[in-house]
UniProtKB/Swiss-Prot annotation:
InterPro entries assigned: Bact_solute-bd_prot1, SBP
Entry annotated with the keyword Signal: yes
Protein's UniProt name: Alpha-glucosides-binding periplasmic protein AglE
Signal peptide (residue range): 1-27
The keyword Transport is assigned to this record: yes
Length: 458
């Protein structure tokens, strides 16, 4: 799926570790000394410490983070170890999706698993391999996460008996609803950052009228060619339809041929299928590699002024380009005419769940409810949170803070739709359908083809 694909290229996961790495932490590993930096909510750590004595116990956690991200996660759980006295062992695997299935079904699960695939979590819950986190945690998410109902919805699955319950805790989020630009180019041309989709469209037309190309769009990605267009469609779907319609779409409760879906395709086509709007013309969209696509922002003169992509894309900016200085981004705006849809955010992220019900596992979920469990990672890199009680000034750099504020201002959050669909669709027919669409095939024909593929796996 797309999430797995991007783990290998994201700035948030540049370094790979060795399969089966295990990590322990103690007080000597604390990145920031408790009480010394007033930006951090040390009181939340002290309060947590009072009620959790786990000396003599061991907590095992299995997750997707390796290399640099593993070291960052270790810097967080070091505070859990210091507060509780528990021995904590973290491990991962290059094929972590398969490994967690093997371990849980074999009866040798970790105490806590952290995964970025809601579909896989749903499978584990349906097999009775997860422990419900309870109504208290559900209420906590509603009260403490911005767009709280969205996070409850994302974390709720059907158990083995078919009863729905909260099985997961969202922790470490990625934002996809971003449009990238070069401030100097905007300043030179007299352009302003749009606040609505109508303004974004007007800016697109203005740039074209000025004889320039507004957008750089590239769908090329080897065997995964087409996936960047699915993010476009998902973002536009959330800005033209209620979130409930989006939810029905990703579950195939409404077909791809529904007007809500083809309408989002057409909105993407407004940008991508107009030769005047895209560097290289519409014919170049499918063949341009997504990694090369943003480079046009930095050409002199610019080959384009706008680029839609998730938070990882600076990994592929030309060497030496600094986000916040040489490049910046803005939230992909909502439609003025659709104010009732609020400020939707498309993204991805990881969710923690209890795969072996132990006091230490339950304590770890409680630890994730403390601001300090978020702020320690925020202060470094590669971490965003919708937790309303954190101090956003802790973020390690202004771009991270800006993305964090986008999450906090969201009225709705939805997970990447193609990652919620069956692999044959979300990492297959949807991708190839988008290539056909930018190549000139009608939205109706593309939608019919994807739906036919979905019907074949029922």
């Amino acid at each position: 799926m797309k999430r797995s694909l991007l783990i290998g290229v994201a700035a948030f996961a540049l370094l790979a570790g060795t399969a089966g790495l295990a990590g322990t932490a103690g007080a000597a590993d604390l990145k920031f000394k408790p009480g010394e930096d007033s930006r951090f909510n040390w009181a939340s750590l002290e309060e947590f410490k009072k009620g959790h004595d786990l000396k003599g116990q061991t907590l095992t956690i299995f997750g997707p983070w390796r290399g640099e991200d593993e070291a960052l996660f270790k810097s967080v759980y070091a505070y859990f170890v210091e507060a509780t006295g528990v021995e904590l062992k973290y491990s991962s695997s290059e094929n972590y999706e398969q490994q967690i299935v093997i371990d849980t079904q074999a009866g040798s699960p970790p105490d806590v698993a952290i995964l970025p695939q809601p579909g896989l979590i749903a499978d584990l819950a349906a097999k009775g391999l997860l422990t419900p986190l309870g109504d208290e945690t559900k209420q906590w998410l509603l009260d403490n996460y911005a767009a709280g109902q969205s996070w409850v919805d994302l974390s709720t699955y059907n158990g083995k008996d078919g009863t729905s319950a909260l099985y997961a805790f969202p922790y470490k989020i990625d934002v996809k609803s971003l449009v990238w630009y070069v401030p100097e180019n905007f300043e030179d041309a007299g352009y302003e950052v749009p606040k609505t989709m109508e303004e974004l469209k007007a800016l697109t037309e203005k740039i074209a009228e000025d004889g320039e190309k507004p957008w750089c769009i590239g769908l090329g990605s080897g065997g995964a060619t087409g996936w960047p267009a699915t993010d476009w469609v998902e973002d536009l779907m959330l800005r033209t339809q209620p979130a409930e319609t989006y939810d029905k779409w990703v579950k195939n409760e409404i077909p791809f041929t529904d007007a809500a879906v083809t309408g989002a395709l057409e909105e993407f086509g407004w940008f991508a299928r107009n030769d005047a709007f895209v560097d290289g013309g519409a014919a170049a969209v499918a063949s341009t590699d997504f990694r090369d696509s943003p480079k046009g922002l930095f050409s002199s003169p610019p080959k384009c002024y706008l680029h839609h992509q998730a938070s990882f894309i600076p990994s592929f900016f030309p060497e030496g380009k600094v986000v916040g200085e040489d490049a910046d981004f803005f939230y992909m705006p909502p439609y003025e005419s659709k104010k009732e849809l609020g400020n939707p955010v498309l993204g991805a992220g990881t969710l923690a769940m209890i795969t072996k019900d132990t006091p230490a596992a339950r304590a770890f979920i409680e630890f994730l409810k403390t601001p300090i469990a978020h702020e320690v990672w925020m202060a470094q890199t590669s971490f965003l949170t919708p937790y309303k009680s954190v101090n956003v000034d802790v973020y390690g750099n202004p771009p991270l803070k800006k993305q964090g504020e986008i999450l906090l201002n969201a009225t709705t959050f939805r997970f990447d739709g193609s990652d919620l669909m069956p692999g044959k669709i979300g990492a297959g027919a949807f991708w190839t359908g988008m290539v056909d669409f930018v190549g000139g095939k009608s939205s109706a024909d593309v939608a019919a083809g994807v739906q036919k593929a979905w019907d074949s796996i029922k």
